[in-house]
């Protein structure tokens, strides 16, 4: 039998890789983990956690305004980015330290440097050290995609937005996915004038159409200048833009400025032109145009693993690659890009490889939340997906919640159930409302268990709440 340095070598110190390493080590395996950036990965360092804290911060402007409608005397104030940013960075440092200590206390050997795969059982660290392992687990996550266009280096991505020196007065957000829409709400709430361009007909492609429309309406009501059917065509530093000089060679122009070579987010005012012909100047441009797996230069293909056309590692139901000793979990596989899913994939991997209990990963009926403003919670099929599969009944209601109605605001809540006519099972649940993420976690339990519409109906409503509508909708609004 071959003698390896480790039973398991994990590449990537995010949520999925860390969990797999810790659990395997707790079971007696010799485990090492390499992380080239910061422990905690996208979720803890530049994703879920800092974003949610920014969501919290951004909602206070609305709360202060609403408080006046409830009789409170509120002194006007301004958001202090410097103070918040300092505390945010301290919190991320604290959480990273927890991840490091959890690995250390589990007996996992840590290497704070890049690692690549050199063969079915081989790993090479950035310092040139070679290691071997019986099993290799790739959990390297993903990174933001920036459009391939001149001037793209002037914009920022979700990686940089948490570390801005100061908040911009005006920001353009490019994209219509969940990251773009979440930051549109965040920055608007923090007092930034936000314009959002998305090339598609409606934001949040892939989600329920009715919910998408409700979210877009809510975003516009809260101040986001949202334009669909619009994309960025050109951008440059405002100091370089002079229509009268377009025919003059760049270096001969009177307003010539050397190419920008500094860090993202510090280029100064940016002139942009849209596909609709609009020309505007913004302090910052945020590209939220998708994410791609971190597989470049890892050596996976040479080791026998298959890489897909989007750069993802191709795996089977047990997260095993085409190379039998190499597995992959999390965003690098481009299955479901959610932290809890990566953690479950890591746990299933340990059961399969180290506990001799082959455990396929269950990716069905995963609840999720989009922290837009208004918030969105969803589980199961969209109306469009369900209608293509079978005959369904749609139960939906849109209304003004008590809290906002009293304050005189035209905020709308959407509660929606998709029900199979044949089995009566609830195939999907979609909620657009403040706090929808908290609600959908519980609704997800019912949908996962196969609850029927009649099961929902048998539950007594909690009054007065928004979520009571989920158990009081008696008549379908349409069938299909």
Identify what each model region corresponds to.
Residues 12-15, 36-37, 174-177, 207, ...:
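Glycine-rich Rossmann-fold phosphate-binding loop(s) that bind the pyrophosphate
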Residues 48, 140-199, 222-226, 301-303, ...:
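Glycine-rich dinucleotide-binding loop and its adjacent helix/turn
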Residues 52-87, 359-361:
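Glycine-rich active-site loop/strand segments that organize a redox cofactor
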Residues 152-168, 279-355, 457:
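FAD-site-proximal beta/loop scaffold in flavoenzymes
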